[in-house]
């Protein structure tokens, strides 16, 4: 009694197609699919960034040595 039958769903689908047209519905579907793909891609990138963040910090001496070698390289290139 309280449920929606297949015929009622079919009538609703026909009305939606008549109101919006197939081209607009196709465009909405592709936009929705693109949004879902983008969301999944962003979630995967976030996971990889978390993995990259799991590193051991360098000591200050190592950081100073690296900065010195980088500045020497920059001076040589200029």
From Swiss-Prot:
It is found in: Cell inner membrane. Residues 47-59 have a biased composition (Basic and acidic residues). GO terms for cellular component: TAT protein transport complex. Keywords: Cell inner membrane, Cell membrane, Membrane, Protein transport, Translocation, Transmembrane, Transmembrane helix, Transport. It comes from the Bacteria. Residues 47-78 are annotated as: Disordered. Residues 60-69 have a biased composition (Polar residues). It is a single-pass membrane protein. One of its GO terms (biological process) is protein transport by the Tat complex. The Tat system comprises two distinct complexes: a TatABC complex, containing multiple copies of TatA, TatB and TatC subunits, and a separate TatA complex, containing only TatA subunits. Substrates initially bind to the TatABC complex, which probably triggers association of the separate TatA complex to form the active translocon. Part of the twin-arginine translocation (Tat) system that transports large folded proteins containing a characteristic twin-arginine motif in their signal peptide across membranes. TatA could form the protein-conducting channel of the Tat system. This is Sec-independent protein translocase protein TatA. It comes from Vibrio vulnificus (strain YJ016). The lineage of its organism: Bacteria, Pseudomonadati, Pseudomonadota, Gammaproteobacteria, Vibrionales.
């Amino acid at each position: 009694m309280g449920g929606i039958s297949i015929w009622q769903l079919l009538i609703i689908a026909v009305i939606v197609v008549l109101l919006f047209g197939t081209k607009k519905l196709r465009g909405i579907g592709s936009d929705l699919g693109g949004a879902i793909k983008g969301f999944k891609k962003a979630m995967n990138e976030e996971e990889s960034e978390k993995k990259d963040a799991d590193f051991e910090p360098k000591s200050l001496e190592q950081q100073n040595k690296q900065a010195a070698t980088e500045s020497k390289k920059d001076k040589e290139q200029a």
